[in-house]
Amino acid sequence: MAISAALILAAGKGTRMKSALVKVLHELAGRPMLGWPLAAAREAGAGQIVIVAGHQADQVQKRFGADAGIRIALQEEQLGTGHAVSCSLDQLDGLSGAVLILCGDTPLLTAATLQRLAAEHAASGAAVTVLTAKLDRPFGYGRIVRDSEGRVRRIVEQKDASPEEQAIDEVNSGIYCMELEFLRSHIGRLGSENAQNEYYLTDLVGIAVAEHAGCSAVVADDPDEIMGVNDRVQLAHAARVLRQRVNLQLMLAGVTLIDPDQTYIDADVQVGNDTIIWPGCVLRGATSIGSGCTLENNVRVSDCVIADRVQLKAGSVLSEAQVAEDVSVGPMAHLRPGSVLQAQVKIGNFVETKKVVMGTGSKASHLTYLGDAEIGSDVNIGCGTITCNYDGRHKHKTVIGDGVFVGSDVQLVAPVTVGANALIAAGTTVTQDVPPDSLAIARTPQVNKTGWCLKKRDNG
């Protein structure tokens, strides 16, 4: 069934989160909470997306407003779900047919469930179709009241429910599929004569029944899908469920997770088959990992492109880096933004790079800082080497040609260029360009004072 649009209600502040950030922008598995029902609606086939924002609407606009398929409606005063929907209808001018109404704080909702909801809506011919769930502890949710034949008659909110109604275990999810024509013509009939003095969208169910327009229902297979996130405990639970879903899909696609419960992978991360990921790894953002890679314990990767057969050894941290095939990084290495490692590069323990291009086969095996540098192929960077790229005001570039050998404890004071196949002696501070095929040595000559230590001891 075609879905004309989806309305996502996201105007609430989320007081129980006890946060300066509006609830729906809290992150789960690499996306803001609101991004999850939005993605589900799109995958289910919704055309236009309308977000109803209220608290921190400017932040919601900043995060989602640049998307051409999303419109933002403003609910300046929060007077209930019915009022929220009424604030959004002018964004749907010119549309007809079915519309999904979702909650911005239900990140576990899936596209498959929305498709079931839309299919039932089309098959039943009802004006309103509601997604429900059966809960062992339904406190706080609106209850689904059915007649003796099992037909939905109305939804009663917790604060307005009688003791008998509170005993009902089938609850309203706050998620609906409605006919736009019915919604437009009846939203103005909602009243606020209830315990919360709000305009309940749920009252449209009773109106639809009373006018014989029809109300249908779909029971969610997994009650977790309708869970609203209202505090940090529920946020952690939802994040755990999403992480399990992400990890399950990766394992089914041929990725080995040694301990899935201790592996944290954002939803938009891509990982190739035959890659092995050890516990404690965190993969974030728009990261892409190739096939046949190994990520040892406690590796963190954010917004990186990693090619095939790369070894990321324990404790390494990579951010906004590009790593070609057959590269080895770590252990305990740090690739900062702008690091580009070409094929067969080796970055060893306690090596830090930033804004560096390292050519094919080059190595920096130990205890090195490389920043603002262009390094050719088959270069050896000795232990303790530093590119001195910052003069206190500006950054400067170091260029090292192909085949250069840099000895241990070398400082390259930028801007400086080292020509191809040159050799920099250990302990040298390079302050001038080095011609190709040359030896550069700049250190005080060694002086041995024979017997000096004996004299020092004898003199006390």
From Swiss-Prot:
A Pfam family annotated for this UniProt entry: Hexapep
Cofactors named for this entry: Mg(2+)
Swiss-Prot/TrEMBL catalytic activity: alpha-D-glucosamine 1-phosphate + acetyl-CoA = N-acetyl-alpha-D-glucosamine 1-phosphate + CoA + H(+); N-acetyl-alpha-D-glucosamine 1-phosphate + UTP + H(+) = UDP-N-acetyl-alpha-D-glucosamine + diphosphate
PANTHER family (alphabetical): BIFUNCTIONAL PROTEIN GLMU, NUCLEOTIDYL TRANSFERASE
InterPro entries for this protein: Bifunctional_GlmU (IPR005882), GlmU-like (IPR050065), GlmU_C_LbH (IPR038009), Hexapep (IPR001451), Hexapep_transf_CS (IPR018357), MobA-like_NTP_Trfase (IPR025877), Nucleotide-diphossugar_trans (IPR029044), Trimer_LpxA-like_sf (IPR011004)
Record has Acetylation as a keyword: no
Residues binding UDP-N-acetyl-alpha-D-glucosamine: 9-12, 23, 75, 80-81, 142, 157, 172, 230, 336, 354, 369, 380
Protein name (database record): Bifunctional protein GlmU
One annotated GO molecular function: UDP-N-acetylglucosamine diphosphorylase activity
Gene transcribed to yield this protein: glmU
Subunit structure as annotated in this protein's UniProt entry: Homotrimer.
Its job: Catalyzes the last two sequential reactions in the de novo biosynthetic pathway for UDP-N-acetylglucosamine (UDP-GlcNAc). The C-terminal domain catalyzes the transfer of acetyl group from acetyl coenzyme A to glucosamine-1-phosphate (GlcN-1-P) to produce N-acetylglucosamine-1-phosphate (GlcNAc-1-P), which is converted into UDP-GlcNAc by the transfer of uridine 5-monophosphate (from uridine 5-triphosphate), a reaction catalyzed by the N-terminal domain.
Pathway where it operates: Nucleotide-sugar biosynthesis; UDP-N-acetyl-alpha-D-glucosamine biosynthesis; N-acetyl-alpha-D-glucosamine 1-phosphate from alpha-D-glucosamine 6-phosphate (route II): step 2/2; Nucleotide-sugar biosynthesis; UDP-N-acetyl-alpha-D-glucosamine biosynthesis; UDP-N-acetyl-alpha-D-glucosamine from N-acetyl-alpha-D-glucosamine 1-phosphate: step 1/1; Bacterial outer membrane biogenesis; LPS lipid A biosynthesis
Similarity-based family: In the N-terminal section; belongs to the N-acetylglucosamine-1-phosphate uridyltransferase family. In the C-terminal section; belongs to the transferase hexapeptide repeat family.
